[in-house]
Amino acid sequence: MGVIEFLLALAQDMILAAIPAVGFAMVFNVPVRALRWCALLGSIGHGSRMILMTSGLNIEWSTFMASMLVGTIGIQWSRWYLAHPKVFTVAAVIPMFPGISAYTAMISAVKISQLGYSEPLMITLLTNFLTASSIVGALSIGLSIPGLWLYRKRPRV
């Protein structure tokens, strides 16, 4: 993949990630003045995850790093715009949730209950379930670590 193709794919990924970020921000009753920032933060998070995955990191670690970036930027923006960090960050990480792997794991579980046990279905179920669980864990831990670091009152040493 050339540089131009990568930049076009990155721009497409970031634009498409902004749409669900704004949608979920509207569901969570985020103030109208903060919707554009939720879209931008969702784009930054999903774009940084794509850059990290393209550079060779797996999806779990890329998601962890991207959610830490989203958490850090959200804390800074919350100081600038006098809002809670969750106003910006929660809707911004929703586009990174593992919908496909969770759906595939659920379909495999339904097939196992209908057709009975088979090793390929069980492997598919476990692989996708563990991937989805790891991504959700990376999102939640990565989003909470910047708050633990930046709001710490005691010295680190």
Curated annotation (Swiss-Prot):
One record GO biological process = succinate transport
Has the keyword Repeat been applied to this entry? Answer: no
Gene assigned in the entry: yjjB
Transmembrane segments in this chain: where? 8-28, 50-70, 87-107, 129-149
Describe the inactivation phenotype. Deletion of yjjPB decreases succinate production in E.coli by 70% under anaerobic conditions.
As for subcellular location, the record says: Cell inner membrane
InterPro entries registered for this protein in UniProt? ThrE_2, ThrE_Dicarb/AminoAcid_Exp, YjjB
How does it sit in the bilayer? Multi-pass membrane protein
Please verify whether the record's keywords include Flavoprotein: no
What protein does this entry describe? Answer: Probable succinate transporter subunit YjjB
Q: What else is known?
A: YjjPB constitutes a split-type ThrE family transporter.
Subunit description: The transporter is composed of YjjB and YjjP.
Its function, per the record, reads: Involved in succinate export with YjjP. Both proteins are required for export. Contributes to succinate production under both aerobic and anaerobic conditions.
